[in-house]
Curated annotation (Swiss-Prot):
<feature type="region of interest" description="Disordered">
    <location>
        <begin position="241"/>
        <end position="280"/>
    </location>
</feature>
<feature type="domain" description="RRM 4">
    <location>
        <begin position="621"/>
        <end position="704"/>
    </location>
</feature>
<keyword id="KW-0698">rRNA processing</keyword>
<feature type="region of interest" description="Disordered">
    <location>
        <begin position="150"/>
        <end position="169"/>
    </location>
</feature>
<dbReference type="GO" id="GO:0006364">
    <property type="term" value="P:rRNA processing"/>
</dbReference>
<comment type="similarity">
    <text>Belongs to the RRM MRD1 family.</text>
</comment>
<dbReference type="InterPro" id="IPR035979">
    <property type="entry name" value="RBD_domain_sf"/>
</dbReference>
<feature type="compositionally biased region" description="Acidic residues">
    <location>
        <begin position="256"/>
        <end position="277"/>
    </location>
</feature>
<feature type="region of interest" description="Disordered">
    <location>
        <begin position="178"/>
        <end position="229"/>
    </location>
</feature>
<dbReference type="GO" id="GO:1990904">
    <property type="term" value="C:ribonucleoprotein complex"/>
</dbReference>
<dbReference type="InterPro" id="IPR034482">
    <property type="entry name" value="Mrd1_RRM3"/>
</dbReference>
<dbReference type="InterPro" id="IPR051945">
    <property type="entry name" value="RRM_MRD1_RNA_proc_ribogen"/>
</dbReference>
<feature type="domain" description="RRM 3">
    <location>
        <begin position="501"/>
        <end position="573"/>
    </location>
</feature>
<feature type="domain" description="RRM 2">
    <location>
        <begin position="314"/>
        <end position="392"/>
    </location>
</feature>
<dbReference type="InterPro" id="IPR000504">
    <property type="entry name" value="RRM_dom"/>
</dbReference>
<keyword id="KW-0677">Repeat</keyword>
<feature type="domain" description="RRM 5">
    <location>
        <begin position="719"/>
        <end position="796"/>
    </location>
</feature>
């Protein structure tokens, strides 16, 4: 958790002051002071950091410290929906419900009554007079005494003693019982009046001539009734709710209660002493239940709508992101749920800064839904994320353009969309015309002289001559890119991740300048760097803003430029190894450049790689070092053995890193060479068991065959090369002319079908490993007749062929022995020549060899 909760803050503290205080221990991404609706501080807040480590350091440093004179306490903030928070919330709710229940209400009301009685007693003791209660029995008695006629009043009645007598009645416990009985009688009278209202309206009218005599008012003489209760008895229509009446009628009310029914009512009252104070049916509760159900249904419909949008688009809209968050960080945050196609961060057009928003597109909409469920409201670099479904803009664009786009426009748009995917062209693809123009301009001859068969005693095939020219241009291009800080090995990681800011511009016409390329891409955003090799056949463009680079890629891909079509491809990640922020554009003249010497290959196979490779070790003086730490480098191993006498070299065996194109990983072992065998023996005894980088070394003498085998497999040190994707029109002579430029060939083989056509692959074998390696480095990006030659080492194929030959020889020996034993068993029978399958296959193989020899002679 990278978010902290800070308690005990001063009430006057501001957000800026809180941010400044906590910025001492890391990069603060969010500050939130909690306030009341009136704006006053609640004296606690939240602080977010970029990483959990920074948050933990701030917690250890600031906890129980002071801001001004207030001591603060800090804890790691809980996530939304945490079980502990839910449990605490339920406990508080239960305590409130317990305090608001019947018993709690009664106890609260009793306490209030006692407090009121106490205050009245204190007031009476202090003043000697008692203030009569409003609406109590005193006011009613005063009213009745005043309203009585003088004939009925007693002349000697002492009116001053009335309040005191009434107070005694109130204090007497019998009054509560009388009030309760009066309340029951009131309810029964109300129920009877409500039930007989209709009957009285439709009943026969009494004799009009007879005058009804008024009945005596018994309630007027009942001193136990209050003013409100008396007035309620005299009202024709009941004011208030009829819930009590409905409940009484549902239980079978009668016009006049019998004794048994009265007993039943008394029993019901005894069983539920609070029934007369509480309504039987709570219409408010039912309304609340209906409202809650309606809100729950609306929430479910809204959630289902969000799910449908996510499943349709597979795209999420993220809010409240840190402004410093990068696309790679967001990608790493969401890629645990599935494959992320794209992360788009909108930027401000003026400042090029993030707006705190992002769009994340998933390959599978189910993965997007899982990310929405898990990460909505989660903490990312100290901020609480808010996730929403995003609309698929590609679908909207397709819907708007389907009606107006022609077939040609639709195909062009499809090509642009496919350009963002895995590109099928070679990374160093160059236009054949540009290659010929570059070589002709450099040599000062016409292009026809370059392509003229047999010119200057060269190859007779124009395709081979053009392929050789392309090979030369590619070597110069690779050297130029290496001088500019480009990782050339990254071009081999075709299936690795691609950069969103570096673009390879291919198939550009010869003579294109860096200014023209910069102007072409500058229409869509800021251009940081443009690299054009001396040949002028390819360009590397770097744009610092990801969104602008994506826009330029979509706009320029397959665009016509100077009579040609531009092919764009995203460069591999790690291509620019020495990139500097804000570096000026490198404007290289198309023809300016120094060509390389092809006789000096860049890779030396025979000598040991790594530190100290310039010295040569004698045979049998190489040590094999095991149990090396994966963090140990060649320099570290060299420094460890450099103090020994006759030290020659030290290297660590490595392999390509599949996650980082162009990088290599240690294999945990290496080799150390010495100039003499005696020095190697001394070093083996001295260094065996030593500790290097917390690892105990195991030092033994290297076996030459094992070392050669390991070197051959790891570095591709073989003399035979497998050539794939060969044109079907290519002949053995074309392959020989192309590959013989890199060294002396021992054999060239093109497997053919039964109709004597090639099968699209072949084999070439050199005399030495150095020549084979030189050919591999020089020709792996070359095109022949428009096809990219795919080169691989064939040492695995050779080992497989050896196993097949051994199995064939065993099978042949088995059948020969069986035939000889049968002939010895019955010598009288005439022996017949029988060929088994192994012999037949051997005969076919021999015939093919003879036919290949004839082709070589031709």
């Amino acid at each position: 958790m990278s978010r902290l909760i800070v308690r005990g803050l001063p009430s006057y503290l501001t957000d800026a002051r809180l941010r400044e205080h906590f910025s001492q221990k890391g990069a603060v991404t969010d500050v939130k002071l909690m306030r009341r609706p009136d704006g006053t501080s609640r004296k606690f807040g939240f602080v977010g950091y970029r990483s959990e480590q920074e948050a933990q350091q701030a917690l250890d440093y600031f906890n129980r410290t002071f801001i001004d004179t207030s001591r603060i306490s800090i804890e790691l903030a809980k996530k939304i929906g945490d079980e502990e928070l839910v449990h605490q919330r339920e406990e508080r709710r239960n305590r409130r419900n317990a305090g608001a229940g019947p018993e709690g209400s009664a106890s609260t009301s009793d306490a209030r009554k006692r407090k009121a009685d106490k205050s009245d007693t204190q007031q009476e003791e202090g003043s000697g007079k008692k203030k009569p209660k409003k609406g109590g029995a005193i006011s009613f008695e005063e009213f009745m005494s005043v309203m009585q006629p003088k004939a009925k009043r007693k002349a000697w009645q002492n009116e001053d003693a009335l309040p005191e007598q009434t107070m005694q009645d109130i204090v007497a416990p019998e009054e509560a019982i009388q009030k309760k009985a009066a309340r029951k009688a009131l309810k029964k009278a109300d129920a009877a009046a409500a039930a007989t209202a209709t009957a009285e309206s439709t009943a026969a009218q009494p004799d009009s001539g007879r005058e009804e005599t008024p009945e005596p008012d018994a309630a007027a003489n009942d001193v136990g009734l209050t003013d409100e209760e008396y007035m309620r008895l005299r009202m024709k229509h009941r004011v208030g709710t009829d819930l009590d009446t409905l409940e009484q009628s549902s239980s079978g009310p009668e016009f006049e209660q019998s004794d048994n029914e009265k007993d039943d009512d008394d029993a019901a009252a005894d069983s539920d002493p609070e029934s007369e104070d509480e309504p039987i049916h709570d219409q408010g509760f039912e309304c609340k239940q209906a409202e809650m159900q309606r809100k729950a249904q609306q929430a479910a419909e809204k959630d289902q709508k969000l799910v449908d949008q996510i499943m349709e688009s597979g795209r999420l809209f993220i809010r409240n992101l840190p402004f410093a968050a990068s696309g790679d960080e967001i990608l790493a945050f969401f890629e645990s749920f599935g494959t992320v196609k794209q992360v788009h961060i909108p930027l401000d057009k003026q400042t090029k800064a993030s707006k705190g928003l992002a769009f994340v597109s998933f390959s599978d909409p189910a993965h997007a839904l899982a990310a929405y469920r898990a990460k909505d409201g989660s903490t990312f670099q100290g901020r609480l994320l808010h996730l929403l479904p995003a609309v698929n803009k590609d679908a909207l664009a397709e819907t708007g353009s389907k009606k107006t786009a022609t077939l040609k426009q639709a195909r062009a748009e499809q090509k642009k969309q496919d350009a963002t995917k895995d590109f099928n062209w070679s990374m160093l693809y160059m236009s054949s015309d540009a290659v010929a123009s570059s070589i002709a301009d450099r040599l000062g001859v016409n292009k026809s002289d370059i392509l003229n068969p047999g010119a200057n005693g060269g190859a007779d095939n124009a395709a081979v001559r053009l392929a050789l020219a392309e090979t030369r241009i590619i070597q110069e291009t690779k050297e130029f890119l290496a001088q500019q800080g480009i990782n050339v090995d990254a071009f081999q990681g075709a299936k690795g991740p691609r950069s969103d800011t570096t673009i390879l511009v291919k198939n550009i016409p010869y003579g294109t300048s860096a200014e023209e390329v910069e102007k072409l891409f500058g229409e869509h955003g800021e251009v940081d760097k443009v690299l054009i090799p001396p040949s002028g056949t390819i360009a590397v463009v770097e744009m610092p803003v990801v969104n602008e680079a994506r826009l330029a890629f979509r706009a320029i891909a397959y665009k016509r430029f100077k009579g040609g079509i531009l092919y764009l491809e995203k460069a591999p990640v790690g291509l620019l190894t020495q990139h500097k922020v804000g570096e000026k554009v490198v404007k290289q003249a198309p023809i300016v450049g120094k060509s390389i010497d092809s006789s000096n290959p860049s890779v030396d196979l025979d000598g040991p790689a790594g530190a100290g490779a310039g010295d040569e070790a004698v045979d049998g003086a190489t040590l094999y070092v095991k149990n090396l730490s994966f963090s140990t480098t060649d320099e570290r191993l060299t420094a460890f053995f450099h103090g020994l006498s006759d030290f020659a070299f030290a290297r660590i065996q490595t392999k390509p890193d599949p996650r980082r194109p162009g990088a290599r990983l240690s294999m945990g072992y290496g080799f150390v060479g010495f100039k003499s065998i005696d020095a190697a023996r001394t070093a083996q005894k001295a260094m065996d068991g030593k500790v290097l980088d917390a690892h105990t070394l195991v030092v033994t003498f290297a076996r030459r065959n094992a070392e050669a085998s390991t070197t051959s497999i790891s570095s591709g040190g073989s003399t035979k090369i497998l050539i794939k994707n060969l044109p079907f029109e290519a002949t053995k002579r074309d392959i020989r002319d192309l590959f013989s430029s890199q060294g002396q060939l021992k054999s060239v083989r093109l497997p053919k079908k039964f109709d004597n056509t090639t099968r699209g692959f072949g084999f070439v074998e050199y005399s030495t490993v150095r020549e084979a390696q030189s050919a591999m480095e020089a020709l792996k990006h070359t095109h022949l007749l428009g096809r990219h030659l795919v080169l691989q080492w064939s040492h695995l194929a050779s080992s497989t062929q050896q196993q097949v030959d051994m199995q064939r020889s065993k099978t042949k020996q088995h059948f020969v022995n069986t035939h000889d034993n049968a002939a010895r068993a019955d010598p009288s029978k005439r022996a017949k020549i029988k060929l088994n399958s192994a012999q037949i296959s051997e005969a076919i193989k021999q015939a093919k060899r003879q036919r290949d020899d004839v082709d070589d002679d031709e």
